[in-house]
Curated annotation (Swiss-Prot):
GO annotation, cellular component aspect: endoplasmic reticulum; membrane
UniProt keyword list: ATP-binding, Hydrolase, Magnesium, Membrane, Nucleotide-binding, Transmembrane, Transmembrane helix
Protein name: AAA-ATPase At3g28510
Organism: Arabidopsis thaliana (Mouse-ear cress)
Principal location class: membrane
EC number assigned by the record: 3.6.1.-
Keyword Signal recorded: no
Compositional bias per record (Polar residues), positions renumbered to this chain: 512-523
Length: 530
């Protein structure tokens, strides 16, 4: 009988030899021949194995979309993992102080359904592709594998998998936590890796009840949102993708971002904050939008500042006309375009949000915000693309009453009449009104805060008056300078004309003198000849 040391020695030699020949096989045997060998090896295993394997990958459609089946299976297996798996991953969930456990990578659990036992395997494959920037960047391709005896094939495919997907979807809805997403640079994401978007839990407290806006206007927006959320069959009947566009425009501080948060809380939707300046090109933009989920709001804030999307098509013709008559200077060089600069175009954005690609998934709201709606290209905000245009204006009396109730818990005050008059005369944003109403210490009560607002409104009115006077003064000075320049130009013109007249008279006199001298010379010549 061999000793333990000898056994380990033989084992080590065998493993070393196997690793050596495996390395030779991987390095020197052509890839197409290896594929041929592996194909027949798996076929041979299939002949002698009584088990069937079904693979569920994390991403489908060539890595463009996340698999809903994979997510449902993950939720289902998470409910089984606590009692069955040996290695677990722990995560927090909303409204719960306890942890939720799921299968760790390369773990397996056994499940039973109607007396039939099956096995689930959690797998991840890490590869090292060559990135565009010459660096080695890892990709993780995750998948679940279901293994069962082949005699149960019909029951597993027709009944068990339907049960798993249904249960997993229900668990996902129960544990769903709304999230706020932001897009990553394409250097950080790959087709099989969930790296296109980063997310954090979305816990913004804004609601329509706390939103400083006219109640009738708020009610109209809420009805529109409810109609949209229940309109799946209606949109299908009229032949439109199940999406809706909102344009929020108005001065800074008027509540555009708060409105987005209120919509998300009202509909229980996720929010995708799309930063266009980090998107490399139109193709990357499409991939980002395809990787968003249904029941979500896609937001592009301050779109008038995002790339060159503001009326560029109208300006193009004007610029071309101006350049027609200009000659290029010799040796003039065009500025180099930075390769890292975003190349997203207006047409690319329009096609992504409203073209054929927009119909790939439904129940989405697209929101644009801007401080200067007049700067935007009309094609970007036309009806049918941005269906609902909502002006977020300066604070008026109805909006003030909402703020007073939220911040001071009062619904009336002796100074309400004066505040209403001053709000009509003064442009003050809801954010500034809210900051003024907020108590700055425990000693400040509602009366102090209301009086402070009245004083602030008076100061703002005075500032506006002085600013208007300064603007009027500047305008008058500008007009005076313009008139002075016009007068100087007129005087210069008159002087030039007078100088030209004098030159003409002088030239005429000189010509007359020359003619007279020539005549005198002729007379003298005649006399000398005679």
């Amino acid at each position: 009988m061999l000793e333990t040391g000898a056994i380990w020695g033989i084992t080590g030699t065998t493993v070393t030899s196997f690793m050596f020949f495996w390395a030779i096989y991987k390095q020197y045997v052509p890839a197409h021949f290896r594929a041929y060998v592996e194909r027949y090896f798996h076929k041979m295993i299939g002949w002698i194995s009584y088990y069937v394997d079904i693979k569920f990958t994390e991403y489908t459609d060539e890595g463009l979309k996340r698999s809903q089946a994979y997510d449902s299976i993950r939720n289902y297996l998470a409910s089984k993992s606590t009692a069955l798996a040996k290695r677990l991953k722990a995560n927090e969930t909303k409204n719960s102080k306890s942890l939720v456990f799921s299968m760790d990578d390369h773990e397996e659990i056994e499940d039973e359904f109607e007396g039939v036992k099956v096995k689930w395997y959690s797998n991840v494959k890490v590869i090292q592709p060559q990135s565009n920037y010459g660096q080695r960047s890892s990709e993780e391709r995750r998948h679940f594998t279901l293994s069962f005896h082949r005699r149960h094939r019909g029951m597993i495919i027709e009944t068990y998998l339907d049960h798993v997907l249904r249960e997993g979807k229900a668990i996902g809805l129960m544990n769903r936590e709304r999230k706020l997403y932001t897009n990553n640079s394409s250097q950080e994401w790959y087709p099989w890796r969930s790296g296109k978007w980063s997310n954090v839990p979305f816990h913004h407290p804004a609601t329509f009840e706390t939103l400083a806006m006219d109640p009738e206007k708020k009610e109209g927006i809420k009805k529109d949102l409810i109609k949209f959320s229940k309109g799946k069959d209606y949109y299908k009947k009229v032949g439109k993708p199940w999406k809706r566009g909102y344009l929020l425009f108005g001065p800074p501080g008027t509540g555009k971002s708060t409105m987005i948060a209120a919509i998300a809380n009202f509909l229980d939707y996720d929010v995708y904050d799309l930063e266009l300046t980090t998107v490399k090109d139109n193709s990357e933009l499409k991939k980002l939008l395809l990787d968003t989920t249904s029941k979500s709001i896609i937001v592009i804030e301050d779109i008038d500042c995002s790339l060159d999307l503001t009326g560029q098509r109208k300006k193009k013709k004007e610029e071309d006309e101006e350049e027609d008559g200009e000659e290029k200077k010799e040796g003039e060089k065009k500025p180099k375009v930075d390769d890292k600069q975003s190349k997203v175009t207006l047409s690319g954005l329009l096609n992504s949000i409203d073209g054929l690609w927009s119909a790939c998934s439904g129940e989405k709201i697209i929101v644009f915000t801007t401080n200067f709606v007049d700067k935007l290209d009309p094609a970007l905000i036309r009806r049918g693309r941005m269906d609902n245009h909502i002006e977020m204006s300066y604070c008026k009396f109805e909006a003030f009453k909402v703020l007073a109730k939220n911040y001071l818990e009062i619904e009336t005050h002796d100074l309400y009449g004066e505040i209403e008059r001053k709000l009509e005369e003064t442009d003050m944003s809801p954010a500034d009104v809210a900051e003024t109403l907020m108590p700055k210490s425990d000693e400040e009560d509602a009366d102090i805060c209301i009086k402070r607002l009245v004083k602030t409104l008076e100061e703002e009115k005075e500032k506006a008056r002085k600013l208007a006077e300064e603007e009027e003064k500047k305008k008058a000075e500008k007009e005076a300078k313009k008139m002075k320049k016009a007068e100087e130009a007129e005087e210069k013109k008159k002087k030039t004309e007078e100088d030209e007249k004098k030159e003409k008279v002088k030239a005429k006199e000189e010509n007359g003198n020359v003619s007279q001298q020539n005549g005198n010379s002729i007379d003298l010549n005649k006399k000398s000849d005679s």
